[in-house]
Design a protein with these regions (language model features):
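Extreme N-terminal leader/targeting segments of oxidoreductases
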Residues: 2-37, 52-56
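Glycine-rich FAD pyrophosphate-binding loop
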Residues: 54-75
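Conserved FAD-binding catalytic core of PHBH/FMO-like flavoproteins
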Residues: 143, 150, 157-160, 165-297, ...
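Glycine-rich, N-terminal phosphate-binding loop of Rossmann-like dinucleotide-binding domains
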Residues: 70, 192-193, 324
Length: 423
């Protein structure tokens, strides 16, 4: 027998034998839930892991600080490497991605007006990437969880993690109005981003953080215009970096490098388009279709890694543990490998009583994270103009680009990293 229950505005399912999830009200206006895996963070990483585990019969609760509308309103990169696309399909959430996503077989690098193609399909052994907006894939994951009555609870406040040591089961608390809700679980997944509470729950004498802050940001514009090029263009220019990207055949995304001191209000649409054209090859600039911006924002660039990615019964994933500059589109794709490792580790634990994957998670995830960090750092260093750059530095950048296109080994390395290193 089972009956529907209502938890903080999200419907779940109550099983009387308590094998999956239970909710009771305590004597002191405290609610209790029980699940196997509590996932903090309802972005694509948390939703995907929840969906994958659900399909294997492993129960989860997802806690998200913001509303669903807020999460879907975030504008993020839309280049998906092969591994992420495969995970979407395995999660039974990839149908629309496969129908509407743009398959890209390469990307262009422009060096002060000279543009050349990196044929990633050729140099990676036949792989490609999918261009599909993060907003859309998040919507698909929400829909997939809804179809299966997945428990995704929004607008949670004051999330706190407790008893993370391995000797006792952990639990998570959050505030719902005047009530405190407690979620008892076997494991906690921190997929709550850079500013979330999960990483902060690891003692400072255990956690080691590595960070590099870049002295510039990206001014991005989203517009309902035809993309200027079928494949992405990464443009190095003495005036600063530029990127021509897209979300679909009628939705374009463009970026230019700007000083950290710049504000969005400093840039009118006309000023943005004018500056973008100056950084592109003349023939590309001539065919650039301009229009009103739908969204405009400035994102600072930073590299960040936290070690370890496991502490007791807490496992970090995605931006909670690592951040990369957007150059090369590794952010969400790096999170995908975290989810892949956690998914398989949890399956082995619950279905095979094998904890090897859980024990090895941090080391395995970090090994791939640092390779993604290296590629993003290389792309950023290769294509941006740094304050204080002298003619010698500029020559080295151009020489690095020349070497890339003169060496099949270099092209193979770039292509392999762009489509995604194997999990």
């Amino acid at each position: 027998m089972r009956k529907a229950i209502h938890v903080n505005g999200a419907f779940g399912v109550y099983y009387s034998n308590q094998q999956a999830c239970a909710l009771t009200r305590g004597a002191h206006a405290e609610e209790h839930m029980k699940t196997q895996v509590c996932i903090i963070g309802g972005g694509p990483s948390g939703l995907m892991l929840s969906q994958l585990l659900h399909l294997k019969g492993i129960d989860t609760v997802v806690l998200e600080k913001h509303s669903r509308e807020y999460v879907l309103g975030r504008i993020r990169a839309g280049v998906l490497e092969r591994g992420f696309a495969e995970l979407m399909r395995e999660a039974e959430a990839g149908e629309r991605m496969d129908a509407e996503g743009e398959i890209h077989h390469g990307f262009y690098i422009s060096d002060n007006g000279t543009m050349r193609l990196v044929d990633v399909e050729k140099y990676s052994g036949g792989s490609s990437v999918v261009v599909y907006g993060q907003t859309e894939l998040t919507r698909d994951l929400y829909d997939a969880r809804a179809r299966m009555n997945g428990k995704v609870i929004h607008n949670v406040e004051d999330v706190a993690l407790h008893d993370l040591n391995e000797s006792t089961p952990p639990y998570v608390t959050y505030r719902d109005g005047d009530e405190i809700v407690r979620v008892d679980c076997d494991y906690v997944i921190g997929a709550d981003g850079f500013h979330g509470p999960s990483r902060k729950a690891i003692p400072k004498d255990v956690l080691k953080e590595y960070e590099k802050v870049y002295p510039f940001g990206w001014l991005g514009v989203l517009s309902r215009t035809k993309p200027v090029n079928p494949e992405l263009i990464y443009a190095r220019h003495d005036r600063g970096f530029a990127l021509c990207s897209l979300r679909s055949q009628v939705l374009s995304r463009y970026y230019i490098q700007v000083p950290l001191s710049d504000k969005v209000e400093d840039w009118s649409d006309a000023a943005f388009w004018e500056e973008l054209k100056k950084r592109l090859p003349e023939d590309v600039a001539a065919r650039l279709e301009t229009g009103p911006s739908i969204e405009k924002s400035i994102a600072p660039l930073r590299s960040f890694v936290a070690e370890p990615m496991r502490y007791g019964n807490l496992f970090l994933a995605g931006d909670a543990a690592h951040i990369v500059p957007p150059t090369g589109a590794r952010g969400l794709n790096t999170a995908a490998s975290d989810i892949y490792y956690l998914y398989h580790a949890m399956m082995d634990h619950y279905l095979k009583s094998d904890d090897t994957g859980l024990q090895e998670y941090s080391a395995k995830a970090l090994a791939r994270v640092w390779k993604a960090q290296r590629f993003s750092w290389w792309m950023t260093s290769l294509l941006h103009t740094f304050p204080g750059t002298n003619p010698y530095d500029q020559k080295l950048q151009s020489t690095d680009i020349e070497y890339l296109f003169s060496s099949e080994a270099a092209l193979s390395s770039a292509a392999e990293n762009y489509v995604g290193l194997p999990f």
